[in-house]
Structure formats: C-alpha cells, structure tokens
Amino acid sequence: MLNSYGGKYLETPNFNRLAEKSVQFNNHYIGSMPCMPARRDMHSGRLSFLHRAWGPLEPFDNSFPELLRLNNTYTHLVTDHYHYFEDGGATYHNRFNSYDFIRGQERDPWKAMVQPPLEKFREKYHKSQLNLENREHVYYFYPINSEFIKEEKDFPSVKCFNSGLDFLQTNKDADNWFLQLETFDPHEPFFAPERFREKIKTKYRGPRLDWPQYERVTESDEEVQELKANYIALIALCDHLL
C-alpha cells in the first residue's frame, strides 16, 4: 500500500519522507500477532506468543517505558487504542509517567445512547456490520460513536496527533523525554473524512460499508471494491497526519 514498499494505490508523500529518514526493512519476521500480544513483545523485548495469548503485561515483565521512567526519562503515551482500558488489556498505559486516552474508536464504549435510532442506523449501515440488539456485541457502539464524529477535527486519530503536537509544544525546551504517539488507524473500521474518499470511485451504491468480516470473502465484487476504497482513504488520512 505504501509507495516506499511498492504500493501504487495512492500517493503517500509523508510516509515516503519518513522512509527516507529511517531504516527500511525488506524482510519482516513476525513475532506475536497484532494487538496486545505485539505490544507485549515491544514493551518487554521478547516473544510472548510462545507461552500466552492476548492479555496484559505481567508483573514480572520488564517494560521499556517503565525502565525509562525509573531512570529519569519522562514518558508519555497518546493513544486512541481503547483495548488499553479493557479487562485483560490493561497494565500497559500505566507504565508511563502520564497518558492521554482519546475516545471513540471502533467499539469503544464512549457515548451513552440508551435508545439508539435503530431504523436510522439500519438504513445508514450495511447489515454485516450492525448489531443493535446486543449491547455486548462488537458492532454495537460503532454507529453510536460515529454520530459524534461529524467533522475532521472530531476523528480520534486527528485528536491523537493534535495531543502529540501539544506535548511537543509544551516540552520543546525540555530534555530526557519519550513520547509514544499511537493511533488505532488504519485498523478497521475504515472510517475517514470524506475528502480522503471523494476521489476514489466505486460502483457500490448501498449503505455504509467500511468494516470487513473476519472470514472468507463472501461480499460481491462491488462490496469488496468499496471496502478497499475506504481502506485507501484511511491510509491517505494517516499519511496526511504524519
């Protein structure tokens, strides 16, 4: 997807600029799978999938932000990754001196809507990514949260970068600090401001479809193209923020 790795779907000038200033790896050997297992690998510097699945840092783990903190380097986390505040996913963020948690991604239980407008949501969203009958379901909060994300400034990843810039502005004259700016995007659902999507045309004419299923492809060709287009738009947002 990224130009620096041969992607041709869109232009990613800011990722290109970052690649020019970075070490670029042509081979990648996976450790633990993404989400919390990968984060435990990165905190502790060792592979966790050999003995445990999805879960928190253990009391015996050496966490690099904590090691920095205990050695007089100020550590700060900015993230909209809501799994940090879930049962089983916690104990990562509190290894930092401070943290700013941005709300509203995916199924983050953010906005309280006791009686959601069911018919409105059924018309607006594809049936494959909607479940409003079960408040415990993974799809329940996404349409609710999206009702409160109306402008580009409302998007959680945009708020993350603004918070990171605030940290840099506040601490530009300080030394010995570490900032971890971590966004949930481009994780699904592939929801980006309209200006990043408007140039990408598809033949799909149905309700909003931006959350692919974790299974074999059963969608029509038009639906697949719509999902791809929304993913490309989200990558474009990430490049813009970078």
Regions found by a protein language model. Give the residues of each.
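A short beta-strand-to-alpha-helix junction
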Residues: 11, 30, 55-61, 225-237
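Short amphipathic alpha-helical segments and helix-helix/interface helices
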Residues: 15, 62-66, 168
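Active-site-proximal cap/lid insertion segments
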Residues: 1-4, 120-159, 165-241
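Short beta-strand segments
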Residues: 1, 27-32, 77-80, 178-185
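Active-site-proximal N-terminal segment of extracellular/periplasmic enzymes that hydrolyze or transfer
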Residues: 1-23, 32
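Catalytic-site neighborhoods of secreted/periplasmic enzymes
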Residues: 39-150
